[in-house]
Every structure is written in structure tokens, then in C-alpha cells.
Amino acid sequence: MQTLKCVVVGDGAVGKTCLLISYTTNQFPADYVPTVFDNYAVTVMIGDEPYTLGLFDTAGQEDYDRLRPLSYPSTDVFLVCFSVISPPSFENVKEKWFPEVHHHCPGVPCLVVGTQIDLRDDKVIIEKLQRQRLRPITSEQGSRLARELKAVKYVECSALTQRGLKNVFDEAIVAALEPPVIKKSKKCAIL
């Protein structure tokens, strides 16, 4: 059985762990516990072929900037996450996460993933953002950023409601199995 390695990166508290736990167990975790490093595995059928999808959760906090890349070797696809209710996490996709991933793993396909879409229309959240002269990130902004960064595509989901959740991983699998022709088909390696 072929294994595909999917590494999830993004700022702390954007919902990376919830995304993985909700997808692998169909349950939403109750507590926030910052991740250092964790991994999950699921078996998925693609056509008639079973694949093991190895899902690697990483720490978004700056304290782990030197450790995090140790999880990158042999990655087949990256999910670069931000929360649609955290404009700073959206900016960091471009300013921090894409540069980091491409530095360590040039040519490995990346998807930009907007998380927490169930909160995009939450009145309390919107008011809180408006007090800071901010607003939730739209699907159009996510798609535009993905095009600008030459990501495979933009997808979004809610780990709480599971809306769009399966699609995130379906798209990641497709990207890992059929990397775009313009990119190198090599897996990530740290020298």
C-alpha cells in the first residue's frame, strides 16, 4: 500500500489540529492544547487502490521555527492553513509559511487552506474584528492568494461542522498524486 505524506503548517491556533482530529475521528476536540508535533494516519481508497495518508501536525508558534522543518523530508503535499477570522494568519501564509515550505521543499505541491469558516458570519467575531478595523477573509481573497503564490488551489473548511473538510484532503491527495507539470516531482529533502 502506497503512503502519501501530508504536512499541515500555519500559525498557532488557526485550527490545524482540529482539522486533523475532526477528519480522522469525526469528532471535534473540546480543548485547545498547542501542538509540538503529532501525526495521524488514515487509509483512503483512490479508485481501487488503498493509500495510507500520513498526516503530520506541526507547531505554528515561533519557538518551534528551528524544529518544525525536521518534519518536512519526504513530504508529498503541504496544507498551508490560516483562519478566515484571523487576518494576521492570512498575511503569514505569504510572509512566513510559503517561504519556509518552498525553502525546505521546492517543488512540493501546496494547498492554501482557510479554516474556521463556521465563524466567518459570527456577529461577535465580526464586531471584534471591526473594532480593529479588520474583517473576515473571503473565499475570493483566499483564491487570489493561492493564485499569487502559485499554490495548487485554495480550499476552505470548518472542522466543527465538517463543511468542506473531506474536500480539503481529497484535493491534497490529488495534488500529491498528480503534481503540476511545472513543478519538480521530487519529494522534500533537507540537506
UniProtKB/Swiss-Prot annotation:
Changing residue 61 to L: Enhances interaction with RGA1. This is Cell division control protein 42. The lineage of its organism: Eukaryota, Fungi, Dikarya, Ascomycota, Saccharomycotina. It comes from Saccharomyces cerevisiae (strain ATCC 204508 / S288c). Gene3D superfamilies: P-loop containing nucleotide triphosphate hydrolases. Keywords: Cell cycle, Cell division, Cell membrane, GTP-binding, Hydrolase, Lipoprotein, Membrane, Methylation, Nucleotide-binding, Pheromone response, Prenylation. PANTHER family: RHO FAMILY GTPASE. Residues 189-191 form a propeptide. InterPro entries: Cdc42, P-loop_NTPase, Small_GTP-bd, Small_GTPase, Small_GTPase_Rho. Belongs to the small GTPase superfamily. Rho family. CDC42 subfamily. The gene is CDC42. GO terms for cellular component: cell periphery; cellular bud neck; cellular bud tip; fungal-type vacuole membrane; incipient cellular bud site; mating projection tip; nuclear envelope; nuclear membrane.
